Amino acid sequence: MSNNYDSSSIKVLKGLDAVRKRPGMYIGDTDDGTGLHHMVFEVVDNSIDEALAGYCKDIVVTIHEDNSVSVSDDGRGIPTEMHPEEKVSAAEVIMTVLHAGGKFDDNSYKVSGGLHGVGVSVVNALSEKVLLTIYRGGKIHSQTYHHGVPQAPLAVVGETERTGTTVRFWPSAQTFTNIEFHYDILAKRLRELSFLNSGVSIKLTDEREEDKKDHFMYEGGIQAFVTHLNRNKTPIHEKVFHFNQEREDGISVEVAMQWNDGFQENIYCFTNNIPQRDGGTHLAGFRGALTRTLNNYMDKEGFSKKAQAATSGDDAREGLTAVVSVKVPDPKFSSQTKDKLVSSEVKSAVESAMNEKLADFLAENPSEAKNVCSKIIDAARAREAARKAREMTRRKGALDLAGLPGKLADCQEKDPALSELYIVEGDSAGGSAKQGRNRKNQAILPLKGKILNVEKARFDKMLSSQEVATLITALGCGIGRDEYNPDKLRYHNIIIMTDADVDGSHIRTLLLTFFYRQMPELIERGYIYIAQPPLYKVKKGKQEQYIKDEEAMNQYQVALAMDGAELHVNADAPALAGEPLEKLVQQYNAAIKLVERMSRRYPYAMLHELIYVPRINAELCADKAAVEAWTQRLVEQLNAKEVGASQYSVLVEHNAELNVYLPKIQVRTHGVTHEYLLSADLINSKEYAKLADLSEALDGLIEAGAFIKRGERVQPISSFAAALDWLIKESRRGLSIQRYKGLGEMNPDQLWETTMDPETRRMMQVTIEDAVGADELFTTLMGDQVEPRRAFIETNALKVANLDV
């Protein structure tokens, strides 16, 4: 480090260097994924601004297989003409110059989410490569950038009738710790945008996974958003309160809200379509007006006298779902990430609009107003009961030694960052865990039976539950609006350790519901983990090994089977062994797994037989006779193998749109007939290509006299599948496999070695990427309404791989 501090020490970061040097200032954290996804939102916000101005109706966001993302819209297209001052195309100025854009010229956009003119130029600076395509003036313009540097000027590459812009970018691994996009995070934001912009179609597709896509298009704006958020809950009044008011100063305030019979408060705030996670002046104005208007109404109508308990703002917001959306010509945020609105004029705008409109709503809808007031009074009484219960607990706690529950085996470490709390199912596993742990930093809390489902329980009832009270005391961070302080948490690693069966899953879900509803910050801060104890223990001779799950078990058995295996495809052929044989086995197993996954849509036997017939492709489908012959062969092989069970017959269907002939197979089982069309999508899919590749690899491989050998043992075979089955059976000789169902089956040493030793254990961190989706899932699975839960189970039942009953 130099001691010279003079004028030469002062660096001026020109162009996009500032962004690369301090990316966090522009897009948020580059390590935890928020900054990475913010890149997509910066580009999407530009398309939304086109929609706000009335020029864009369709936005398509695609996560490509190579983990790049493209955002395409049908807006006006970025201007392509030469910029009068910069002497390069306007598009290049927008892509490479900070604080350049159409948001400063008040005539181009009245209100916009883009504010500082840094959005797309930041994306360009922090991407390894950007491909810009503009459709404008009847021409297609294209330009490529590497790390923000244009490789050539904007060039015309074709003609078109459409207008719009497509930006495809590959994030830079030099900036981001992790460059993998999460579908749920993008889906959450795009869903919000589609509600906030009625009639705009937003499509999201993930090419990394089969059939993963969503189409968000909602009429009804934020009113529909509130209905969507409450759809699995029970609203206490039918009508969604909604107003949209535009003021003379250009600020427009739109609010939609509805109370449900739950106990959670859900308020979503937006400024110019951009969400404010930390609220701001619009939230303050909304809360103030809500409490004041409701209190005035309750005093006037005599509800306050009946209540016999003073109501607070928190009571008024219990069970409230609301969306507050403001449009502000020149908004001020606390940072470029726009997480908090600080424009002071917005608070009074929201307050005055809410006061007036909510008072009118309550006066015009007396029965709905009565329901809301009754709920607020109930909340106030419950809060009072909870306060008394807490005081009782505190008085009782003063008598206990250090106020910690007797069940808790605490650790010696006092630094929360180094301490771990294992929440263990049942006293027997708790005993093993207490004996096996490292006392220095591992505490154990055994929970007896199932804790209360907090989704259905009121706060005072929850506090009276013994298991919940024990858990709250052990955590040390308090609970409830007045007492809860996540900074007082005694352990920064809370590990849920339950059995690998139905009861274990249920207890884990109940605990996650508790943390999500009562202490969400613990999940947001990454303190909650789920232990992943092994499912199997295998023993061969004196060697023991723990195996985490079914997939690892299959891999272990295949590796064992390959040891010393030789495949002779005929009596005289040289042996196929080692890596070539292993690759073929892996290819076969991957295909079988694919068949199992696809068997939700087609019969397993039919898919499996595709491995043993030649490839069918688009070329073959143009010839009807060829398709008939191919289908006939498939059907004959199926009928020969499935004697008596099912009868297969041939049909061929002509697809007029594509002008191709497609195989259609009729299956008759126990007198019931079903038809299955092998569609053009299936024939052209990556999945079918993998089955066809295996078909070509196995075609003619096994000849007369073929045999498989492992060590000294030899077995004649007629198919590759028979060879693999024999090898697996052989490898199991002398192998003892134990499947663990409960943690209590392990002794303390085994529990330490497999689940508690930081060197060898596996844990899964609990995170929330899509808060709306998570809220919906907890409500569906753990709430009062049966119908949404039944629909969820019926929809997802076929996707279950292992059902433990």
From Swiss-Prot:
Q: Which proteins does it associate with, and in what oligomeric form?
A: Heterotetramer, composed of two GyrA and two GyrB chains. In the heterotetramer, GyrA contains the active site tyrosine that forms a transient covalent intermediate with DNA, while GyrB binds cofactors and catalyzes ATP hydrolysis.
GO molecular function terms attached to this record = ATP binding; DNA binding; DNA topoisomerase type II (double strand cut, ATP-hydrolyzing) activity; metal ion binding
- What does the record give as EC number? 5.6.2.2
> Which cofactor names does the annotation list?
Mg(2+); Mn(2+); Ca(2+)
Q: Where does Mg(2+) 2 bind?
A: D499, D501
What's one GO-annotated cellular component? Answer: chromosome
Q: Which InterPro entries match?
A: DNA_gyrase_B_C (IPR002288), GyrB (IPR011557), GyrB_hook (IPR049353), GyrB_insert (IPR041423), HATPase_C_sf (IPR036890), Ribosomal_Su5_D2-typ_SF (IPR020568), Ribsml_uS5_D2-typ_fold_subgr (IPR014721), Topo_IIA (IPR001241)
GO BP, sorted A to Z: DNA topological change; DNA-templated DNA replication
Q: Which residues form the Toprim domain?
A: 419-534
Sequence similarity? Belongs to the type II topoisomerase GyrB family.
- What protein name is recorded for this chain? DNA gyrase subunit B
Q: Which organism is it from?
A: Vibrio cholerae serotype O1 (strain ATCC 39315 / El Tor Inaba N16961)
> At which residues is there a site annotated Interaction with DNA?
K450, N453
The protein's gene is named gyrB
How the cofactor is bound: the record states: Binds two Mg(2+) per subunit. The magnesium ions form salt bridges with both the protein and the DNA. Can also accept other divalent metal cations, such as Mn(2+) or Ca(2+).
Q: Cross-referenced NCBIfam families, in alphabetical order?
A: gyrB, PRK05644.1, PRK14939.1
General function of this protein = A type II topoisomerase that negatively supercoils closed circular double-stranded (ds) DNA in an ATP-dependent manner to modulate DNA topology and maintain chromosomes in an underwound state. Negative supercoiling favors strand separation, and DNA replication, transcription, recombination and repair, all of which involve strand separation. Also able to catalyze the interconversion of other topological isomers of dsDNA rings, including catenanes and knotted rings. Type II topoisomerases break and join 2 DNA strands simultaneously in an ATP-dependent manner.
Principal localization?
Answer: cytoplasm
Where does this protein reside within or beyond the cell? Answer: Cytoplasm
Q: Which Pfam families match?
A: DNA_gyraseB, DNA_gyraseB_C, GyrB_hook, GyrB_insert, HATPase_c, Toprim
Task: Extract the Gene3D superfamilies matched here.
Answer: 3.10.20.690, 3.30.230.10, 3.40.50.670, Histidine kinase-like ATPase, C-terminal domain
What keywords is this UniProt entry annotated with?
ATP-binding, Cytoplasm, DNA-binding, Isomerase, Magnesium, Metal-binding, Nucleotide-binding, Topoisomerase
The record lists the catalysed reaction(s) as:
ATP-dependent breakage, passage and rejoining of double-stranded DNA
> Out of the domains of life, which is the source?
Bacteria
- Binding locations of Mg(2+) 1: E425, D499
* Additional free-text comment from the UniProt record: Few gyrases are as efficient as E.coli at forming negative supercoils. Not all organisms have 2 type II topoisomerases; in organisms with a single type II topoisomerase this enzyme also has to decatenate newly replicated chromosomes.
